[in-house]
UniProtKB/Swiss-Prot annotation:
The modification N6-acetyllysine is found at residues 208, 319, 338, 421, 472. This is Splicing factor, proline- and glutamine-rich. One of its GO terms (biological process) is activation of innate immune response. The gene is SFPQ. The modification Phosphothreonine is found at residues 368, 687. The N-terminus is blocked. Phosphorylated on multiple serine and threonine residues during apoptosis. In vitro phosphorylated by PKC. Phosphorylation stimulates binding to DNA and D-loop formation, but inhibits binding to RNA. Phosphorylation of C-terminal tyrosines promotes its cytoplasmic localization, impaired its binding to polypyrimidine RNA and led to cell cycle arrest. In resting T-cells is phosphorylated at Thr-687 by GSK3B which is proposed to promote association with THRAP and to prevent binding to PTPRC/CD45 pre-mRNA; T-cell activation leads to reduced phosphorylation at Thr-687. Residues 120-132 have a biased composition (Low complexity). The coiled coil domain mediates interaction with NONO, and can also mediate formation of long, linear homooligomers (in vitro). The coiled coil domain is required for optimal DNA binding, and optimal transcription activation. The record marks 662-663 as: Breakpoint for translocation to form SFPQ-TFE3.
Length: 707
C-alpha cells in the first residue's frame, strides 16, 4: 500500500497505473488522460488533448468501478504535476502497434499484458507523487475528438485481456462510443484454449498472451499481471480487498504451465521457446567441470503407490532434465532415479518431498553412495588431484576430495567416490592387505568404507516412530531440572560420565599424538641412518668397482707388456736370423772366393806359364815380375829381360806394359777366356784381351805368406 499508492491516480477498477477516473466522480486526473469518447477495452491510438482540458481542477474522490467508464475525464490535472510533455504534432499510425519491449526476466515466462509493458513484482515505484512516469496512462481507446490526431506517446502500463478487440486506425473526426457499464465484462485471461476474438498479438516488442491462470477480474477492471501470471490487485475502488496479495507459484510451476490462449501457432512457438529456455537454465545449474549422472545425483523416492509405472515415475522428474538410471521396487514402494547434476537433484528433492500422490506423501532423499571410501592418515601435501590420480588405478572415480578445516588446512582425511562397487571393493582390499603410499614419506593411507550420515533433513516429527516408549518420553515437555530432585541428581551423574569420557578421549588423543610424534622422530632418525647406510653401501660399491677396474687395467697393461715383450723378442729373433743368414751368406761367399783362389794358387807351372805368357817376358819391368820376387823365375830360359829378347821393340813392349799397368779393372775389357785358355805367347799388340787376368794370383790371401 505504501509504495503502490503513488501508482494509482484516480479511482475506478483499474490496475496500478490507472490514472484519472470518470468525470462525474472527479478522480485525480492525469494530464495525459483520454478524451471523453475513449472506451475501456480498446487499445489506445494517437490522441490529442480534449477540447475541454483547459485548467487544473481540485481533487475529486475516486468513483465506483461500474461508473468509471461513463464519466467524462476531469479537465484539469493536479496542481502539483509538472507541465505535460508535448508529443509530435503529426499523426504516425505505425506507432500504435509498436510499443517498446517490456523488461523480461530470462528465467521467467512471458506474461499477459496489453500493448504496454507491465512492471514486475520487484519493479521500482515512481520517484514521487508529484513526478509520475513519463508514459501517459490510458484505458486503451481510439483517438479522441480533439482538433487533430496526435501520435501515441510511450505505451500505457495497464494490462489488457486477451480477448480485447484489435486497435483501431487513427481518425480525426468521430470518436467511438465506449462500452457501457452494464455490458458484458471482458473475458478473463485465465481461460485456456483459443479466445473468441483475435489473438492479442504483440507488436515488434510486445509480449505474448498470458499463460497463467488468474487474469484481470471482470468487475474490477484489468489488473496488472505479475511475471508468474497472477494479477496485482487494485488498491482503490477495485473488486478485491485493499492490500490483497496472491501466492506466487513455485519455481517449477512458473516454467511449466498449460498452453497459452490464442492460436495454435502461438502456443507451439511459446512451448518451443519455453522448453529451450528451460534447457538453457538447466545447463547453467551445472558447475564447470562437474561430472554428470553420478551417484551424488541419485535420489531415493519412498512411499510410492503400488501401481506406479516407470513412465509415470519418469514424468514425475521430467521437468528436472533427462533422467538417467531408474529403478522401482513396487512391492516395497520405493525407487531410485539419477538426474544430470547435483543442483537439479537438490531442486527436485526440495520440490517433490512431501508431495501428495494418490493419497500418499512422497519421501525424497539423496541415496547413499554405495561405492564411497573414507581415506585417513593423509599427508598435508596431498591434494584432491593427487588423491584422484592415486586411486584412479582401481577404477573410474566420480569425486575425490580432501577434507579441510575452516582455514583450508588439511585434516588428514578424505573421501573417494568410485563409479562402481567392484572398483571400490578392489581399492579397499588392496590398500588393507598392502601398504599404499602417496608421498615420499613412508606414511601409508588407511582406507575404510565411508560412514554416511544425513545431516540435512534429520529426523522430522512426522517420521518419528509413535510407539508407547515415544508416548511415554514425550509426556513431559523440555525443562530445566530443579536442584535437589531425582532427575537433577542423575542428570549430574550423566554429565560427570560424559565429562569422564571427554577426559579419557582427550588423554587417548594426547597419547596418540605423543606416539605419532615419537614415531615421526624415530622415523626421521632411522631415515637419516638409512640414508647414511645407503651412502656407505654406495661408497663401498664404488670402491669395489674402482678396485675391479684397476685390476682390469693392470691386467690389460700386463697383457700389453707381454705382447710388447713377445713382439720385441720376435723382432730380435728375426734380426738374429737375418744376421746369421747374412753371415752364412758371407761365409759361403768367402768360401767360394777362397776355393776359387785356392784353385788358382795351386795351378801347375805349365798352366800358369800359359796364362801369364810364354818366355817369361811378362815379368820384365813388372813389380810382380821376377825382378821383384824372391822366388826363382817361372819362365824358361836364362835371361828374361829386355836384353834377352832383342827381337821385341822397346816401344811396343813399353806400350803393352803401360796399358796393363793403367787398367783399373781386375779383369780385361775383352772377352774373358777360360782360366786354362792359352793365349799367344809373347808381348806386343797381339796380346789377348784376358792378358792381365793372370795377375790375380798375386793378390789372393793364400799368396801373402810368400812375400
Amino acid at each position: 500500500m505504501s509504495r503502490d499508492r503513488f501508482r494509482s491516480r484516480g479511482g475506478g477498477g483499474g490496475g496500478f497505473h490507472r490514472r484519472g477516473g470518470g468525470g462525474g466522480r472527479g478522480g485525480l486526473h492525469d494530464f495525459r488522460s483520454p478524451p471523453p469518447g475513449m472506451g475501456l477495452n480498446q487499445n489506445r491510438g494517437p490522441m490529442g488533448p480534449g477540447p475541454g482540458q483547459s485548467g487544473p481542477k481540485p481533487p475529486i474522490p475516486p468513483p465506483p468501478p461500474h461508473q468509471q467508464q461513463q464519466q467524462p475525464p476531469p479537465q484539469q490535472p493536479p496542481p502539483q504535476q509538472p507541465p505535460p510533455h508535448q508529443p509530435p504534432p503529426h499523426p504516425q499510425p505505425h506507432q500504435q502497434q509498436q510499443p517498446p519491449p517490456p523488461p523480461q526476466d530470462s528465467s521467467k515466462p512471458v506474461v499477459a499484458q496489453g500493448p504496454g509493458p507491465a512492471p514486475g513484482v520487484g519493479s521500482a515505484p515512481p520517484a514521487s507523487s508529484s513526478a509520475p512516469p513519463a508514459t501517459p496512462p490510458t484505458s486503451g481507446a481510439p483517438p479522441g475528438s480533439g482538433p487533430g490526431p496526435t501520435p501515441t506517446p510511450p505505451p500505457a502500463v495497464t494490462s489488457a485481456p486477451p480477448g480485447a478487440p484489435p486497435p483501431t486506425p487513427p481518425s480525426s473526426g468521430v470518436p467511438t462510443t465506449p462500452p457501457q457499464a452494464g455490458g458484458p465484462p471482458p473475458p478473463p485471461a485465465a481461460v485456456p484454449g483459443p479466445g473468441p476474438g483475435p489473438k492479442q498479438g504483440p507488436g515488434p516488442g510486445g509480449p505474448k498472451g498470458g499463460k497463467m491462470p488468474g487474469g484481470p477480474k471482470p468487475g474490477g477492471g484489468p489488473g496488472l499481471s505479475t511475471p508468474g501470471g497472477h494479477p496485482k490487485p487494485p488498491h482503490r475502488g477495485g473488486g478485491e480487498p485493499r492490500g490483497g496479495r496472491q501466492h506466487h507459484p513455485p519455481y517449477h510451476q512458473q516454467h511449466h504451465q498449460g498452453p497459452p490462449p490464442g492460436g495454435p501457432g502461438g502456443r507451439s512457438e511459446e512451448k518451443i521457446s519455453d522448453s529451450e529456455g528451460f534447457k538453457a537454465n538447466l545447463s547453467l545449474l551445472r558447475r564447470p567441470g562437474e561430472k554428470t549422472y553420478t551417484q551424488r545425483c541419485r535420489l531415493f523416492v519412498g512411499n510410492l503407490p503400488a501401481d506406479i509405472t516407470e513412465d509415470e515415475f519418469k514424468r514425475l522428474f521430467a521437468k528436472y532434465g533427462e533422467p538417467g538410471e531408474v529403478f522401482i521396487n513396487k512391492g516395497k514402494g520405493f525407487g531410485f532415479i539419477k538426474l544430470e547434476s547435483r543442483a537439479l537433484a537438490e531442486i527436485a528433492k526440495a520440490e517433490l518431498d512431501d508431495t501428495p500422490m494418490r493419497g500418499r506423501q512422497l519421501r525424497v532423499r539423496f541415496a547413499t553412495h554405495a561405492a564411497a571410501l573414507s581415506v585417513r592418515n593423509l599427508s598435508p601435501y596431498v591434494s584432491n588431484e593427487l588423491l584422484e590420480e592415486a586411486f584412479s588405478q582401481f577404477g573410474p572415480i566420480e569425486r575425490a576430495v580432501v577434507i579441510v578445516d575452516d582455514r583450508g588446512r588439511s585434516t588428514g582425511k578424505g573421501i573417494v567416490e568410485f563409479a562402481s562397487k567392484p572398483a571400490a571393493r578392489k581399492a579397499f582390499e588392496r590398500c588393507s592387505e598392502g601398504v599404499f603410499l602417496l608421498t615420499t614419506t613412508p606414511r601409508p593411507v588407511i582406507v575404510e568404507p565411508l560412514e554416511q550420515l544425513d545431516d540435512e533433513d534429520g529426523l522430522p516429527e512426522k517420521l518419528a516412530q509413535k510407539n508407547p516408549m515415544y508416548q511415554k518420553e514425550r509426556e513431559t515437555p523440555p525443562r530445566f531440572a530443579q536442584h535437589g530432585t531425582f532427575e537433577y541428581e542423575y542428570s549430574q551423574r550423566w554429565k560427570s560420565l560424559d565429562e569422564m569420557e571427554k577426559q579419557q578421549r582427550e588423554q587417548v588423543e594426547k597419547n596418540m599424538k605423543d606416539a605419532k610424534d615419537k614415531l615421526e622422530s624415530e622415523m626421521e632418525d632411522a631415515y637419516h641412518e638409512h640414508q647414511a647406510n645407503l651412502l656407505r653401501q654406495d661408497l663401498m660399491r664404488r670402491q669395489e668397482e674402482l678396485r675391479r677396474m684397476e685390476e682390469l687395467h693392470n691386467q690389460e697393461m700386463q697383457k700389453r707388456k707381454e705382447m710388447q715383450l713377445r713382439q720385441e723378442e720376435e723382432r730380435r729373433r728375426r734380426e738374429e736370423e737375418m744376421m746369421i743368414r747374412q753371415r752364412e751368406m758371407e761365409e759361403q761367399m768367402r768360401r767360394q772366393r777362397e776355393e776359387s783362389y785356392s784353385r788358382m794358387g795351386y795351378m801347375d807351372p805349365r798352366e800358369r806359364d800359359m796364362r801369364m805368357g810364354g818366355g817369361g817376358a811378362m815379368n820384365m819391368g813388372d813389380p810382380y815380375g821376377s825382378g821383384g820376387q824372391k822366388f826363382p823365375p817361372l819362365g824358361g830360359g836364362g835371361g828374361i829381360g829386355y836384353e834377352a829378347n832383342p827381337g821385341v821393340p822397346p816401344a811396343t813392349m813399353s806400350g803393352s806394359m803401360m796399358g796393363s799397368d793403367m787398367r783399373t779393372e781386375r779383369f780385361g775389357q775383352g772377352g774373358a777366356g777360360p782360366v786354362g785358355g792359352q793365349g799367344p805367347r809373347g808381348m806386343g799388340p797381339g796380346t789377348p784381351a784376358g792378358y792381365g787376368r793372370g795377375r790375380e794370383e798375386y793378390e789372393g790371401p793364400n799368396k801373402k805368406p810368400r812375400f
